[in-house]
Amino acid sequence: MNTSIKSTHFIKILFFYSSIVFCQSFKHSVVMPVPDLSFHPSVFYGLDVLEQMDFKPMYDKSVGVFTNQTAVNRKGHHLLDILKNHSKVKVEVIFTPQYGLFTQQDKRFKMKDGEKYDPDHGARIVEVFGRNMKPPAWSIRDLDLILIDIQDTGVRFSTYISTMTKILEVASEWSLPVIILDRPNPLRGDRVDGPIIRSKFQSFEGYHIVPIRHGLTIGELAIMANEMGWIKDLKRANLTIIPMANWKRSYWLDKSEHPWINPHPSIKSIRTNLSFSGFGLLEGTNLNDGKGTDKPYLIAGAPWLSGYHLADKLSKLKLPGIKILPVEYIPRMKQTDQSPPLYVDELCSGVEIQIIDPNLYDPLATAT
């Protein structure tokens, strides 16, 4: 009986994946019609599309914004900088994810009465990671809607998508509309890899029942959570997605003209992001995953390991798309680190992954 239930749930997930890819309509979520931009060669993200609409869905509304440093348009202008010059939109609260608004070294915010606020908008800054895993009631009771614009990593254990779903949970409790500005899956939308997490192992870093490399955009993942009943107590949010224009599922993130903005202090390139989908699994093991170096998720090692022996063994496997080299390194504490890396200040021996062809590289197979 349990096997049957699990099989049925898995079939529902597969069916929903196909419905997203083929753009079927949804019962509880809306994908907003957008202007036809097919004449233009560039990819337009949700923020770019909303700009083309002059932010009309937000006119004369008090808005809470969930965002970080990644919310930039095609010209590199940040969402909050664009909105501060818009007379018909009032940003009341800024919700920030893990690592903060503009990372932990953010100099933009000010302190007033012991609380953070953004001086450009006069808006409170509320962290929704750590002590508050979702927006507290006082922060949303006077809002008209919540706007979400954040670049995800395309990997299940990203906390950004977990926080997004917790925001949908709070919004459903308060009947508060949510608008999500869609952004690409950086690792292509046509590649899916890794197992679906078992429900008994779910956590904040494994919140959604999707593969490790899930192939969904952040908007698609929000629709999935809303339609599949993954919000607490099977509630549904009043969810609207402003989609992208001209994006294709076969695109890597660097295919667009948008500037690369690190989505995570340790993810500084699309190749690091790709490797994160495999080497991120090393967190919690007795291997350092490259944190504390300038090549996180591209090297792995430990003081007790022989990198030369391991590199020789792995090279014989002829793993596609990569070259494996022995390496020695010393992890150091960095300003952006929230905690010391494993084996900080110790000499580690291990391997380095040099990505030759990202289309052939299988991070999960390599890491496991």
Give residue spans per PLM region.
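Glycine/threonine-rich flexible loop motifs
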Residues: 152-164
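Conserved anion/nucleotide-ligand pocket segment
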Residues: 202-276
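Glycine-rich oxoanion-binding loops at beta->alpha junctions
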Residues: 107, 111-143, 155
